């Protein structure tokens, strides 16, 4: 007997099945490892692209703060100093070394591509086409990110949002800008990366859930390590590394959960369309 909760129960059942089948916890761990290897090459490429566009000079500092805060919300200053040092060292590398760093950055994009296509159960792209897609993401991604942050910075500086016009809701609106940017970023990832046409509504729904978990998770993570700083007693000066690993693991898990939610919505819609088509065929046969 069907009730109002039957669709939700069916969705939950399929979601849990796919969560186990796709081994999202293991996938999140693999992406965390790939991110740790590729974070310096990726940031180096991003800032190199930014340096080619003078319009982004004023945004670079904001972008650094954005990246470091999201990669390691508990120790963004320390992580930022180390990564700045690594990036400075990378400028002394030869052409072969720079190419190797770019390859490592492309490998991270490949890992993300494989994980998301595995969730949607889509076939792999051809090698040349995959390289073209990855290179486009690596080159255009930072530009899109820079434009988004530039717009966010511009909006922040508007008198309306600074509250200079005595509009109290301005500050509240301003607080949603990072969340909206995160939501839009996840939506684009879910809509573009899988090797199939994705329903944009489903991608946005999954991205919304991922953005909520990501935002709340970051706040909860910062609260925990501030309230219970026992990790510093255990790891001492090395405390930044395990914290960064833990947050990266959680971040990728949130992103994969949102992707899985969008994929299940696509799967359910496909099943419903097939049922409707079957009913239409049966009705025609009866006539």
From Swiss-Prot:
Q: Name one Pfam family in it.
A: Virul_fac_BrkB
Bilayer-spanning residue ranges: 36-56, 93-113, 131-151, 173-193, 205-225, 237-257
NCBIfam families the UniProt entry points to: PRK01637.1 (NF002457), yihY_not_rbn (TIGR00765)
Q: Where in the cell is it found?
A: Cell inner membrane
Major localisation? membrane
How this chain sits in the membrane, per its record, is:
Multi-pass membrane protein
Q: What is this protein called?
A: UPF0761 membrane protein Asuc_0342
Q: Which species?
A: Actinobacillus succinogenes (strain ATCC 55618 / DSM 22257 / CCUG 43843 / 130Z)
Lineage start: Bacteria, Pseudomonadati, Pseudomonadota, Gammaproteobacteria, Pasteurellales
InterPro entries per the UniProt record, alphabetical: UPF0761_bac, Virul_fac_BrkB
Highest taxon, organism lineage: Bacteria
Q: Which family does it belong to?
A: Belongs to the UPF0761 family.
Give me the Gene Ontology terms describing cellular component: plasma membrane
Q: Which PANTHER family match?
A: INNER MEMBRANE PROTEIN YHJD (PTHR30213), UPF0761 MEMBRANE PROTEIN YIHY (PTHR30213:SF0)
Which keywords does UniProt give here? Cell inner membrane, Cell membrane, Membrane, Transmembrane, Transmembrane helix
Where are the disulfide bridges? none
């Amino acid at each position: 007997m069907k009730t109002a909760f039957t669709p939700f129960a069916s969705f939950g059942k399929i979601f849990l099945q796919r969560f186990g089948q796709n081994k999202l916890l293991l996938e999140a761990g693999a992406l965390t490892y790939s991110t740790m290897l590729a974070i310096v090459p990726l940031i180096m490429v991003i800032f190199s692209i930014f340096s080619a566009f003078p319009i982004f000079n004023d945004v670079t500092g904001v972008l650094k703060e954005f990246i470091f805060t999201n990669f390691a919300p508990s120790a963004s200053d320390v992580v930022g100093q180390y990564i700045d040092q690594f990036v400075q060292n990378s400028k002394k590398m030869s052409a072969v070394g720079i190419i190797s760093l770019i390859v490592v950055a492309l490998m991270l994009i490949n890992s993300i591509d494989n994980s998301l296509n595995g969730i949607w159960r889509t076939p792999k792209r051809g090698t040349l086409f995959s390289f073209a897609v990855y290179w486009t993401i690596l080159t255009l991604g930072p530009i899109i990110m820079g434009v988004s942050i530039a717009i966010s910075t511009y909006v922040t500086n508007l008198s309306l949002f600074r509250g200079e016009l005595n509009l109290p809701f301005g500050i509240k609106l301003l607080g949603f800008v990072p969340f909206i940017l995160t939501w839009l970023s996840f939506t684009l990832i879910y809509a573009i990366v899988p090797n199939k046409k994705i329903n944009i509504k489903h991608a946005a729904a999954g991205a919304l859930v991922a953005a909520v978990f990501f935002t709340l998770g970051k706040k909860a993570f910062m609260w925990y390590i501030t309230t219970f700083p026992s990790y510093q007693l255990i790891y001492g000066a090395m405390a930044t590394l395990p914290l960064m690993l833990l947050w990266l693991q959680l971040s990728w898990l949130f992103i994969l959960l949102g992707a899985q939610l969008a994929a299940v919505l696509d799967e359910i819609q496909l099943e419903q369309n097939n049922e409707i088509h079957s009913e239409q065929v049966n009705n025609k046969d009866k006539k």
